[in-house]
Design a protein with these regions (language model features):
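Selective transmembrane helix interface/packing segments
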Residues: 1-205
Length: 205
């Protein structure tokens, strides 16, 4: 998908260019990057605490930026009308890939922190719980996939339909709604990911 490739490349280039020459007195690019990182760190700190926020910031921060920019790309003039230019998060395969990445990272953190004891917790309190706990582990990312996909796809479809009925008045109000929904959905996705990753990292396992 063209939009996804452009967004991914833009995030990578921004990260490289803004951190290439770090200085005591930051320039504009470094200053913007530091403000964004600080904002994301404070957001995560409010959910999972400072230590966990610092540990998981690279993954969760990148996830948040990708999702929110992808959501916002849906308000571009040709989005949804030209093949390859739809918002990436309106594609089930993309939202599924995001959920799979979170799923893998969650269990990586669990194994990193607890080793074989993390694997063993799927059999507690009794081994008969194994199928239920495995189903829960797979259902969690699936639910996030469907939630993000459904809302962004539905929002794009409704926006295009209403805009065609009232092209002079609808766009501004609908774009404002799209901006709000895009940000909220990125926050919800990352907040749920925070909960699952922190559970895997916690001492309960």
């Amino acid at each position: 998908m063209i939009t996804m490739s452009v967004i991914t490349l833009a995030i990578c280039l921004w990260a490289i260019l803004s951190t290439r020459k770090l200085e005591e007195r930051p320039g504009k690019a470094q200053n913007v990057a530091e403000k964004i990182v600080e904002m994301l760190l404070n957001f995560l700190t409010g959910i999972i605490g400072r230590d966990n926020a610092r540990d998981f910031l690279p993954f969760l921060g990148t996830m948040f930026l990708f999702i929110v920019i992808s959501n916002y790309s849906g308000i571009l003039p040709l989005a949804g009308r030209v093949p390859g230019l739809a918002a990436p998060t309106s594609s089930l395969s993309i939202t599924g890939a995001l959920a799979v990445c979170t799923f893998l990272y969650t269990h990586y953190v669990g194994i990193r922190n607890h080793g074989r004891h993390y694997i063993q917790h799927f059999t507690k309190p009794v081994i008969f719980m194994l199928p239920i706990l495995l189903m829960e582990a797979f259902i969690r990312p699936m639910s996030r996939t469907l939630r993000l996909y459904g809302i962004i796809y539905g929002e794009e479809a409704v926006t295009m339909e209403i805009a065609s009925l009232a092209p002079a008045l609808a766009p501004l109000a609908l774009h404002a709604l799209s901006l709000l929904l895009g940000f909220v959905q990125a926050m919800v996705f990352v907040m749920l990911s925070c909960v699952y990753i922190t559970e895997a990292a916690g001492e309960a396992h």
